Amino acid sequence: MSTGVVLFAPPEAPNYVDAIVEQAREAAAAGLRSAWFGQRFDYDSPGLAAIVGREVPQLRVGSSAIPIFGRHPLLVSSQAQTTQAATHGRYDLGLALGAPAFMEATFGLPYDRPIGLLREFLTVVRSLVETGSADFHGERLSTTTLMSAKVPGAEPTVPVLVAAMGPQALRVTGELADGTIPYLAGPKTLDEHIVPTITSAAQKAGRPAPRVVTLLPVVVTSDVDRVRENAERQLAMYDQLPSYHRVVGLEGKDRAAELAVIGDEETVAAAIRRYRAAGATEIVATETDLGGPADQRRTWRLLGELAND
């Protein structure tokens, strides 16, 4: 099973990009197969992925994930194809609807009809990355390419993933994208909700079996109580977001921190294998720094070993 890690540089880093490249080198040395970068309001995720992919050719790189509100698919396609060319075909484009509270406050746009926007965005971005052109006029998006939008060297076609966990988003994703990037979705939720819904939609659309790139907090540690307390603080914000509250509840849990995989090597390895049995095609660890640098290195070593499992 492919294992990867979401990378974030510490706030005290004098140069964010340099710090991420160094982390990526350490992750590759530990045997991890991929590095992923969220899209916040500071750095640019595809740009960071392009740099890391060039500097650390052992790793596949991905964006996890870019909110589609406030962005046009033509510009996202240009970024994704440039990164795909820069990394010689080792980039995964992850898209997301984003949380309404963040999208409305940040971009000043109403968070309305998100599923309709997702369908239109995926239709356009797929056309652009596959053919280099688009002529689409929908309710939310419109574009006509007056010249080629294809980036030479952006081969193979950029895989498009969506951070979809709700049934409507999963159906659209299965129909139009290459897979999903669920976060804080436990094995039961994968097995009973996410995997069946997206797989059925892909089959009906005549598409290949979708990837299920599962993101989850992982820390290998001997101090479980301390790391669990840190996880409670770090993940508390997700308890206030309806989409995450729902998916945590589907697992029979009350708080996001209960989904964090924390323990010794045997405990963590067993948990990750349960995710694989539930339908995860790839595991990407997040919040691996909750126990400090030594625990993070220990976590990455185990994940590197599991990549050969």
Where do the protein language model's features map onto the residues?
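Active-site-adjacent structural elements that line small-molecule/cofactor binding pockets in enzymes
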Residues: M1-D309
